[in-house]
């Protein structure tokens, strides 16, 4: 029994070391590509999807912009136009991409149902909704409010997640399941926060000014909590 426990501990320690080793963006991207190639080999019926979303791209940001733009495509703003907006944001504010990378590592570390780095990237709507918000937030600070609101609206329709473009959200965020999450205009969510579905960071009722909650670093908010 002791040898079994020690072996499991060694495997867990190795996984923790692996997370530390992929701190650089390139390492994370290469790890994701290896995972997705293995997925494509194992499930050939999805090979086209895996190639379109990950394997056909040279960089993490290229893949992310393609994936999100494909999800947000509409009859009034094409996926091509949305992708150009995202690439503009990534170029002007590299911290947007860095935050996405940190989010993936946080989800992989905290969510026991997540067994790879590519899983949240490809399949978790909480991760995807948050990355669109990061672009909308950048647009908001460029005074491009209409476009920021459009992205917010699309996220609400597609993912059932409603985050005001002005809301300040840190890195290492996990929106687990994410359905029904609402985050208001003056809310602040610091680094390493986890929240489950149905969480509302709502207003106090004031007509203007600072009126939404401030969630400090490392907090866990359980499902259906309204603050």
Segments (PLM) and residue ranges:
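Active-site anion/phosphate-binding pocket segments in diverse small-molecule metabolic enzymes
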Residues: 179
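Hydrophobic face of beta-strands forming the core of extended beta-sheets/solenoids
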Residues: 163, 169, 175, 183, ...
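Extended hydrophobic/aromatic segments used for targeting, binding, or gating
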Residues: 205-210
């Amino acid at each position: 029994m002791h040898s079994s426990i020690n072996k499991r501990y060694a495997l867990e320690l190795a996984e923790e070391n692996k997370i530390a080793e992929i701190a650089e963006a390139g390492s994370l991207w290469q790890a994701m590509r290896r995972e997705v190639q293995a997925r494509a080999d194992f499930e050939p019926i999805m090979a086209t999807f895996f190639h379109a979303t990950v394997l056909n791209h040279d960089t993490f940001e290229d893949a992310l912009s393609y994936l999100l733009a494909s999800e947000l495509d509409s009859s009034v703003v094409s996926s091509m136009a949305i992708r150009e907006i995202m690439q503009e944001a990534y170029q002007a504010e590299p911290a947007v991409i860095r935050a996405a990378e940190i989010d993936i590592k946080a989800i992989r570390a905290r969510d026991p149902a997540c067994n790879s780095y590519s899983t949240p990237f490809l399949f978790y709507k909480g991760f995807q909704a948050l990355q669109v918000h990061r672009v909308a937030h950048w647009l908001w600070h460029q005074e491009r409010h209409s476009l920021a609101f459009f992205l917010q609206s699309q996220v609400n329709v597609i993912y059932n997640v409603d985050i005001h473009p002005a809301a300040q959200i840190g890195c290492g965020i996990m929106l687990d399941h994410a359905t029904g999450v609402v985050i208001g205009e003056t809310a602040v969510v610091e680094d390493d926060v986890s929240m489950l579905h149905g969480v509302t960071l709502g207003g106090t009722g004031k007509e203007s000014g600072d009126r939404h909650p401030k969630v400090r670093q490392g907090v866990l908010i359980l499902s259906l909590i309204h603050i």
